[in-house]
Every structure is written in structure tokens, then in C-alpha cells.
Amino acid sequence: MKIAAIGGGVIGGGWIARFILAGHDVTVFDPHPEANRIVTEVMANAAEAWGRLYQSPLPKPGSINWASSIAEAVAGADYIQESVPERLDLKHRIIAEIEATASPQAIIASSTSGFKPSELREGSVHSERVIVAHPFNPVYLLPVVEVVGGGVAAQRASDILVSVGMKPVQIGREIDAHIGDRLLEAIWREALWLVKDGIATTQEIDDIIRYGFGLRWAQMGLFETYRIAGGEAGMRHFLAQFGPALKWPWTKLMDVPEFNDELIDLIAGQSDAQSGAYSIRELERIRDSNLIGIFHALKANDWGAGQTVKAMENRFYARNGKVQADYPLRLHEAHVNGGWVDYNGHMTEFRYLQVLGDATDALLIHIGLDADYRAAGHSAYTVETHIRHLAEVKAGARLTVETRLLGYDDKRLRLHHAILNEDGETVATGEHMLLHVDTKANRTVAMPPALMRALDHLNAQEEGPLPDHAGSGIRAVRLKETSA
């Protein structure tokens, strides 16, 4: 699938990064003289974040190609993401230029935060394929995207967005600013009043959000949070208790403070005092790191945004476990990013196990033990592991894992992995014993014939002697005798 991106700013750069990291080539057009630098910096942040977000092996990144015109960028593209400034006349001109060259079947998705599809489609030749796909920053991490416009194009776009790890929400009726920005604007408007009236500073408002209801919203949203607030009686009790307050009201509603230089200076000054010690890039990295921690917590509970991470990891595992004729198998590669390095300057201990575990997952998928197989109630559990650390691995290294089958029977599987660096040197080995289990009954069971046939096929390729360290335990170092 060929992707085209028109506009490479903060949002456009995030789109570009997400598609490239998911393995797609992207052709970009942006006449801004700093576009290449901006996208390169966003890509660096995104690559670092994905390396920490996903525990599965990542695909080989796609390539970025810079076009000298819109026509060159969209030629042959299947999906076109427009992320130019929020001016309707500009978007009309860009969409017209896209349609002049793009395939009639190509989806044209606008990142607009405010305009409706009906407005974007004015003057369009193939208006049915012009839709809204409005993301949230950082696009390479936050999965939700508001898809507005309906029809076949919206569904096709949603399928594509799911494949790159996003959570498309198709909005059935168009409205100015869609859903997310309408909610954000209400909070923003009220916050401006609180600052202008001297009731709270920017830091106090941010603290109340990030130490309070923001944490609830990140995992429960608005209505589910209030459902819990209603106690055992649920949402009806909450509405009965707090509904009358809507008639008071507490908020400024549609009143907006006069947006003048005085208000701008007040807010900008407080913001500088609050966060001026950090550069924007530093704040972005802090934000990304915190988001990754939240994603991991949600994934552990199979909840909310964590489900999108889990689903994407399953896609990566399935892609990685491709059929391979050569033996020993080379089913997994890894790139050591900066987040994998410890205080000694080399890859930290548990990352070796992660690489070995990813290689085991790739082998299991290779023989047919994939996500569908696990969902049906069977899996393989590792019950014993022996790792040997043979050489240091630095940040930036690219690793390949060679996998051999050392033994098997109807319930057990014994594997050997060798982690190789780019020079072919073995930097670590892992030997693992796995049991085939019925996850519903929580007991060991025999593997089905299809898995046994796949293992028989690997066994037929196993010709060399076992590694001389196979089956050995950790080297003995005895305690010194002490006098009584």
C-alpha cells in the first residue's frame, strides 16, 4: 500500500512516523523550508517511543520520499493524508490538486480539527472519497482518530488505520469540530476564565487535571467515570444526585474572556514559569515516556488504549512468524534503541530475555501457534530458561536470532536461540523448555497433529550436533567454609 502525506508539520509528521514505523513507504510533499528537519525530529521521537511501547518485534520501517509537487506525491497512492493549516480555501485548493492526479479510488483523508466533510467536499470531483480522519497529538502514539464522512471510503480508511495500530471512531453525523475538540474547547474556555479572573494559575489547573480526574479519564473516559461515582446504583443515581447542578450553573458556558494581549501575556508568563526549564523536545519525550507507561498498565489489564497496543503486537508477531525455508531459522530481528541501555552503557539484562522471548513467539507462530490458536484456548508456557551473556551490546546495534529445535514430544518443546550481532558474532544464547497447555483447564495437554507435523518438519532439517553448552546449568561457585 502506498501512502501520501501532504503536510509535514506536527500532525503531518506524526502521521508520517506512524505509517513508516508500521512498515509503509510514504511520499511527502511540504514546501516549508524546515519540513525535512521537523519530520526527522518527529521520526526520532516516534522510533524511540515505538521501541519502548511494543514488546513484539517491530517490522522493518518503510521509507520516506520527498516529492517536489502534490502531483508527484499522490501519483499511485492508495491513501492520502492531508494535514495543511486550518483554512478552508487552502484545503479546497489542495484537494483539487490531489484529485487532478490521484487515482479515483484513492482515499483523501483530512486531519482537520474543525471542518465538516460536507465543507471539504465542495467542488470535489469524487466527493465520496473525501473524509475526515482527525487524530490527536502525538499521532504516532495516541490511537484514536475521528473518522467522519461515512460510506465505503470511511470504512476502508478505518480498516487501514486499524492496521497501523489506531482506534478509528466513525462518527455518524457531522458537526463542527467533531467530538474531541468540542469537549476540549469547553474545558479550555473555562480554564481561560479561571486564569483571567485570578482564581488559578496555569500550573494549578494542570496539577488538578494530571493529579486528579485526568488519570481517571485516561482509562475510563467521562461517562464510565461518572457511572462509578454513582456507586452501586450506577449512572441513574449519579444523574439524580448531580443533574440539578446543571441549572445553577457552575461554568461560564459560552461566555469567552476577551482574548487580548493582556490575557496572552498572563497565560504565556505563567506557562513559562511552569515549564520554561524544558525545551519542547524534552517535554515531548517526557510526555511520550509517561504515555508509554500508561499504555503498558492498560495493556496488562486488557483495557482501553492498551487493547490497541495488544492488537498491534499480535499483528507484528504474526508478520514476523513468516514461513522460512532456511535452517537454522532466522525469524526475529531487533534494534537496540536508547531505552534498552542501562547505567553501564550496554543493553540491560532483561532486554536479552525480551529478544529471546520474541524469537520464541516468532517460532510458535511459525509452527501454527498464533493469536487465533491462543484465543481458542491453547498456548505454550515457558517453564525453564538458561541464558548466557557472551558479549556486550551497545545502543544502535541490530540483532538477529538463530533458532534451533533441540527436542520435542507431544507436550514439550525444547528450543535454542543464538543472538547474533551485525558481524555474525554470538552475543548471547538462550535455551528454553516449553509446555503445551490448555489455558482454560490450566493443565498440560498433548499438541494437535498439525503442530506435531510442523515440528517433525523442523526436526528433519536439524542435522548438526547439539551446542556443547546445551543442557548445562550455571557454573558452580561455592561458598567459603566458615568457622562455627
Swiss-Prot record:
Paired cysteines (S-S): none
Taxon lineage: Bacteria, Pseudomonadati, Pseudomonadota, Alphaproteobacteria, Hyphomicrobiales
Stored Pfam families: 3HCDH, 3HCDH_N, 4HBT_2
Native source organism of the sequence: Agrobacterium fabrum (strain C58 / ATCC 33970) (Agrobacterium tumefaciens (strain C58))
The protein's name: L-carnitine dehydrogenase/betainyl-CoA thioesterase
Subunit structure: Homodimer.
EC number: 1.1.1.108, 3.1.2.33
Protein task: Multifunctional enzyme that catalyzes the NAD(+)-dependent oxidation of L-carnitine to 3-dehydrocarnitine and the cleavage of betainyl-CoA (N,N,N-trimethylglycyl-CoA) into glycine betaine and coenzyme A.
Keyword Disulfide bond: no
Span of the signal peptide: none
Keywords per UniProt: Cytoplasm, Hydrolase, Multifunctional enzyme, NAD, Oxidoreductase, Plasmid
Residues that bind NAD(+): 7-12
Family: In the N-terminal section; belongs to the 3-hydroxyacyl-CoA dehydrogenase family. L-carnitine dehydrogenase subfamily.
Xref: SUPFAM superfamilies: 6-phosphogluconate dehydrogenase C-terminal domain-like, NAD(P)-binding Rossmann-fold domains, Thioesterase/thiol ester dehydrase-isomerase
HAMAP family reported in the protein's UniProt record: L_carnitine_dehydrog
Gene3D superfamilies hit by this protein: Hotdog Thioesterase, N-(1-d-carboxylethyl)-l-norvaline Dehydrogenase, domain 2, NAD(P)-binding Rossmann-like Domain
